[in-house]
Amino acid sequence: MIWLNSYLFHLSLICFYYHNCILTYAHLYIKTRKCTIEASYAQQKSVFDTSTPLPLNHEGLGLSFSSIFLHNSFMNILQKIFTDYYEEIKYTLHPRNSEMENIDKMINCGNPAFGGAMYGCPHCGNLKFVPFRCHSRFCPTCGNKYSMERSTSMSFKLINVQHRHCVFTIDENLRDFFLKDRSLLNCLFHSVTSVVSRMFFKLNKSKNFTPGFLMVLHTFGRDLKWNPHIHCLISEGGYSDDGFWRNVKHFNYTYLRNAFRTALLNELESCLGSSFKKIKAKCYSDHKSGFYVYAKPNKCDPKNVIKYIGRYLGRPVIATSRIDKYDGELVTFHYNRHEDEKYVVETIPAMDFIKRLIRHIPEKHFKMIRYGGLYARHRSIDSKLHRTIHKSKHHFYRSFNQWRTAILSSFGYDPLLCSECSHQMEFLELYYNHQRVSLEELYEKAMSKSRGKRSSA
């Protein structure tokens, strides 16, 4: 026991020594890299006005940096609409806390006053300021990036089999219940989970076949009106408890419709009590063949799984490309009608447009994406299943979601290539509230935090 304690003590000393060596090396690298870039800028200082201090000095930001701020301070059309009606939204609509939080984030997305990263070209001295983003799912820019990241994460879970995309819809008379009490949205997930699991269990009760399925809640239709429904991606097959896989090509949609109607109405009655019985009876009489459950005509091919999920499951409420016109009072937007794919152009007052949008902002920490069956459990027997994307390729696919690579793949240009000489631009410094935050300062903060943790331990 004594030799074990001695061994652990010496091991901790070695780890502590190497930890300090790595941090010291990182500090030296930062200082060396910064000096190299500063020297390069000093050689190229003729490109700057001689009366303007160099961007990298510690006296101030200089005129050149101010011009960069002015160049980047622009709003997209959605930010303009919400900025114009901000007071009216806040004091007449009385939005929920989560709505107001996301509106504030979206309006200030890309605002240089909230900080960003400065890049410079060591070859010609050209500067580029990249502002921080808001990371709100409500923001069309950040929401799209969030969708890309979630689509990639979801695709990593999928088994290498064909998947069926089913959509579970509800009676129009039930929609207001979910709008008034958003906790009821959980009932949709519970109902779909029980129905899909039951359908596969009935294939062979002794084998207990379990599918893999993921569910995404959409609260909006194409016209932006409140229409909660579940998109569900279901594996065309199930895995038994003894490790046997069974392919399932036929889905019983009659069963799915009736079972989903029954499961959802029972869930709602248990939450709402006896006051819901009249509505429940009306739903049964109006929908004798069950709630509408349909499958998308094109299946989710394992080879194109990320693209498929991103297109159908992970999209934000509205893209700015769908907003055609805003004149300060009216907003014109377009969509393809779901029933017949007809192109529809709609013009409505700006406040009505805002109301339609903000109601789709979920409560904080509410999970819009959930996993069921094989994708929700972690059993050793499930590790034998082959995934669509092998674990060794996860890092490669995640790299496409980094902001630089995402812009390059989406728009065909590299944001960190100098616009003047096409050389690679270098990261210089961070800025927050128009003030420089040096890498040395960040290093010192990290070191002090590390020392604090060691002393408390």
Predicted regions mapped to residue ranges:
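Beta->alpha loop/short-helix hinge microenvironment recognizer with preference
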Residues: 15-17, 21-39, 45-457
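Short polybasic linear motifs
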Residues: 8
